Amino acid sequence: MIGKRLQLARTAAGMSLRDLEAKLDKMVSAQALSKYERDEMMPGSDVLAALARALGVPESYLLGQNDLTLESVEFRKNLITSRKEEASIKASVLSEVERYLEIEDFVGVGSASWSRPQGSPYRVEELADAELAAGRLRSAWNLGSDSIPDLTEFLEERGIKVIPLKLGERISGLMCLAHRSKGADVPIVIVNQEDTGERQRFTLAHELAHHVLQAPEGARGEKLAHRFASAFLMPAETLWREVGKHRESISLGELLELKILFKTSIQAIAYRLKDLEIIDAPTMKRLYEEFVRRGWRKPPYAEPGAIPPEKPERFRRLCYRAVSEGAISESKCAELLGLSVRELNRRLENPA
């Protein structure tokens, strides 16, 4: 039966039953669509094909049997305007995760296993605790104090699925767990694919905090996760080495060089310098006023030296492997990657 998946795909597309009826040119009524979703009726092959086209999903998706559910869904910013918007985002997340797990099954590799780092979850009540927790995690993962070149790849190697989605300018990201009846839960971080690379990296570190910290809920917990992310991406020892332990002033040019080093925003670096008391409150105030004057404090946050978004490469590598080994057809590979078969062949034979 297709009920659950049909409802999920419709919700992900942001359509009501009446909207879908109109999209199908009234090929079937909203009442019939409702019965499909309640598994009281099964559409014929022609209607199934039309539903797939209207919803932008393959027929195989509607006919699939995976029983994934999302748990512990937490949006980084409490700015969802409606239940419809929230349901649409959750449906899109489930669809993306399902594709990921499907290709892992085809290749037979299984998910990279997430295991909690040594000593976690780290209990944090104060900002100093968040600083210590970031250092403990870096130590548990043998990261030293250097900048992490590709945080997305690093987290995927440790079993966290990273999925970019269009979330609109109000939402930076979210975290959740995908629960399946067979197999371990899969931790997931969703980042806004329209954000710059430096903003995505901070979101990843912020959402990682929710996976590894035991912290208060609400605004206090968000503040602690924010400090953890800052300390995890920009260790104090490295900043002290680069800029010293106390500065009367710092130029935008120097902040830009630090942005290139840490792959975080100029503004995040400035706040980190303030947190570590490398610069004082009046210096931070002057910098903040300059950020406002230059328009960096509001979308599109157009700082110089934008960092390219990191791309989750593991999913694509698995798709290429599966088609090369004959585990899936070219059409299935193209479907999973959202490409035409022609474009897939071009990428396989003539990569740029």
What would you call each of these model-derived segments?
Residues 1-352:
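Short juxta-domain linker segments that transition from a proline/glycine-rich
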